[in-house]
Amino acid sequence: ALADDGESTKINTNIYEGLVKYADDSTEIVPCLAESWDVSDDGLSYTFHLRQGVKFHDGTDFNAEAVKINYDRQLPGNATENMSYAGFIFGSVKDIVVDDDYTVTINLTEAQTPFLANLAMVQGSPIVSPKALEDNNNDVTQAPCGTGPYKFVRWDVEQDVILERNEDYWGEPAKTKNVIFKIIKDNSARVIALNNGEADIIDGVDSNVVD
């Protein structure tokens, strides 16, 4: 679920969401799985009021306990070495308190001005289905399960990753039914795939292979 490279992040951001996010083409912080939030006067406590009626892709409920489970595992002393952003985002977090089913408070050890901005980086703070974490021994690499507009279908290593539209998504439905992320390492081969109609979009192409 946690990504530290650009290509994986492009996939993860379709599957997972965080409490807050960046507005399109902007650095403004806007609601996502949290509808609103309050910050204490001393900047040490962030209380998030969560969106109700949201389901994970496996049909389980998104709630405050799910947030706590996800964030607790990234706190200092709990984070594993594959959690590249844990120290950056959660290093100053003291604890996470479930106030009620849809309210959660994050307490900090010291005020951190960019805390919300850091939390908006979904690649480092995705909300994963607690059931999926439990069922897969905390490794959902092969079975990612979030609340996002697309659901994971398959990952064929070195070939492609296939996602399908989440028909039960709480927000605006995705416009495309399926998305296939093809893994084509060679720059020239990516350009050929685009020109042949085998790909709709490509990226990471060097200028010297484009006419």
PLM regions and their residue ranges:
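Short, well-ordered beta-strand elements
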Residues: 1, 35, 45-48, 67-70, ...
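Gly/Pro-rich hinge or "lid" segments in bacterial periplasmic/extracellular proteins
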Residues: 23-24, 120-174, 178, 188
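Aromatic- and charge-enriched surface segment that lines or borders ligand/interaction sites
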Residues: 35-80, 105, 190-193
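Sec-exported extracytoplasmic/periplasmic mature domains
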Residues: 20, 24, 55, 72-79, ...
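Ligand-site clamp/hinge motif
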Residues: 166-210
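N-terminal lobe/hinge region of extracytoplasmic solute-binding protein
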Residues: 1-41, 72, 145
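Surface-exposed binding/hinge segments that line
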Residues: 49, 84-131
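Residue-level recognition of beta-strand termini and adjacent short loop/turns
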Residues: 40-41, 98-100, 157
